[in-house]
């Protein structure tokens, strides 16, 4: 059963889970996670990071473009599952990868943004904001659905390992795509977009056509 406990945080917050069991699952757009955190912080949202990989560990941080700033640190393997459930349940939003924490977010009913280029969108649950490799660049994607994953190879990228196209399925997912997902789920952000559109209509000759 889902614990019926109040939120541990005051005010609105989002949860992020930027680590996973395979490197191919990571979102490897340089600086992407920090830009998303800054976007949320600047709009009054706390950002809670919940992964078993400890924040501040140089090796793990290097996979995220450096040590993330502006987060509430709830990382580490010492935190039990029920604690994770409570934090996710009361969040306004969850942003994660093709990993177990994303499935947990979906299971408790929290709006979920799932970032994955190495698996096709049909691989996970449907009712989420699913971010996939842009289809405008003829970019490689979906290797998880086309090849057997080698869990012993951290740099597993069956089509482009050791080439400039290594992990391009993930690198080409932009920060703007993730922010669009945030706007989709957070009503006040969507309202701001609509207000800007209306203002443009009023001030521009394009308003005659709307």
Residue ranges and their predicted role:
Residues 1-25, 189-192:
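Mid-sequence helix-capping/hinge segment at a functional interface
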Residues 30-123:
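Donor-binding and catalytic core of enzymes assembling or modifying cell-surface/extracellular glycoconjugates
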Residues 202-210:
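Long, low-complexity, intrinsically disordered segments
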């Amino acid at each position: 059963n889902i614990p019926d406990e109040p939120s541990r945080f005051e005010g609105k917050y989002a949860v992020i889970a930027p680590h996973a069991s395979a490197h191919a699952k990571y979102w490897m757009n340089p600086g992407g996670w920090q830009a998303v955190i800054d976007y949320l912080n600047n709009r009054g949202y706390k950002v809670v990071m919940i992964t078993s990989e400890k924040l501040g560990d140089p090796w793990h941080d290097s996979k995220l473009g450096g040590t993330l700033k502006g987060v509430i640190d709830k990382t580490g393997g010492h935190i039990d599952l029920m604690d994770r459930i409570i934090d996710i349940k009361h969040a306004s939003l969850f942003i994660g990868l093709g990993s177990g924490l994303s499935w947990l977010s979906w299971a408790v009913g929290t709006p979920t943004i799932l970032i994955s280029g190495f698996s096709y969108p049909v691989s996970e649950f449907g009712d989420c904001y699913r971010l996939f490799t842009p289809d405008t660049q003829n970019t490689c994607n979906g290797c998880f659905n086309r090849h057997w994953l080698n869990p012993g190879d951290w740099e597993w990228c069956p089509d482009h390992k050791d080439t400039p196209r290594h992990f391009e399925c993930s690198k080409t997912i932009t920060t703007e795509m993730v922010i669009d997902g945030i706007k989709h789920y957070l009503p006040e952000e969507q309202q701001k977009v609509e207000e800007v559109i209306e203002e443009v209509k009023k001030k521009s000759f394009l308003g005659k056509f709307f």
